[in-house]
Amino acid sequence: MKKLLALLLAAVMFALPALAMADDLTMGSWRTEDADAVSALLAKYEELTGVKIVYQPTTSTQYNATLRQQLDGGIGPDLFYSRTYSTGAELYDNGFNVNCADIPGVKENFTATALEGFTAADGGIFAVPFAAVSHFVYYNKAVFAENGIEVPATFEAFLAVCEQLKAKGITPLANGIAANWDILECVLCGMIPNYITAEERLAYESGEKKLNDETWVRIFTDFAKLVPYLPEAFASIDNDQANVMFGLGQSAMLIDGSWSYGTLSGDDYDIDVGFFPMPAPAGKAAGFSLHPDFGIAGNAASAHPEEVKAFLAWLATVDGAKEAAKVIPEGFLPLINADVAPEGSVISAMNAVGEGKNADRRFVWNMMALYTPFVDQLNAICRGEQTPEGAANAINALWEAELAK
């Protein structure tokens, strides 16, 4: 494998005079906020190989549509961030992605679990796994200490903490519903592994288990118990505003993704941030949300096919993953099967809190037809317009109709 990688890199080096006169390679992404970090990684790669790759991110809400238009028009980036599961597989199924199954290191350095989110129905691998994310309850350590609060071990204890804070005039949670994604991805999907194992999730996906059964009514019921502890103006608060609210000390906690840790613990805010997974109800096995977030894909129509494959091969090495781990924002968890966390990184601590728990990815990712309906039902529960039973029945009816197509 190392010999093949060396040959690929050597081929790139040999072609440098031509590359110097040709257009630079480009990389598409939905993470505009990572421009400096990813550019540093690409600069390191250029230092090693002489190949320049220009980072060209698109606003996250426009990325999927923009990328598809570019690929359809034959002007897509040479490399691009790939979504996982069905959304990412759709591009591969339409012939846009390099099949990474034969890229050196991909099958050797990533576990079957890591590759699952990037594997198409025909067994092809449509991207090199890059980073996973998790979902946590962030808490202000000073507020907890001042009020004699310890990290809760059960969901019931978590609700008691929220009630204690609210009684003292402290807003327990900064979360809102205006963004129409984080209430599902961060809040509900952070809760679900406490109720449903990965194996049980598959039974829901197939229709063997129903989305309005006792378990799902319980999940929606417990979600509804969080609503009294949201800010008064929760309907108009989006994810960015929730982060600012928590960062400025205007709430004691925030349920959000691991990717927000770097910002919340950074220089913009003067708070000491702790985190814990949403605890399971008493008597239930603790779960942990660990979701493969994105990989790096190669454009099958790139004018620089060998350079694309060489970069993907580099990312699939331990050395490449170590370089990536140095610059990607705190809270993104490398998917390679090796310890590549930089010294002092929060990655090890985030992985540690998930040890021994029932880990699974975001529930809805193989049921994307339910994404918006889930958000709508959660928003309706928050506004007092829907009951947990009604939400479960609505979601189940939609999925049964989808399976019947």
Where on the chain are the PLM-derived regions?
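C-terminal lobe and pocket-closing loops
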Residues: 89-90, 259-270, 281-376
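Hinge/lid segment of periplasmic solute-binding proteins
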Residues: 83-136, 150, 159, 165, ...
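Extracytoplasmic "Venus flytrap"/periplasmic binding protein-like
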Residues: 44-113, 117, 142-153, 252-253, ...
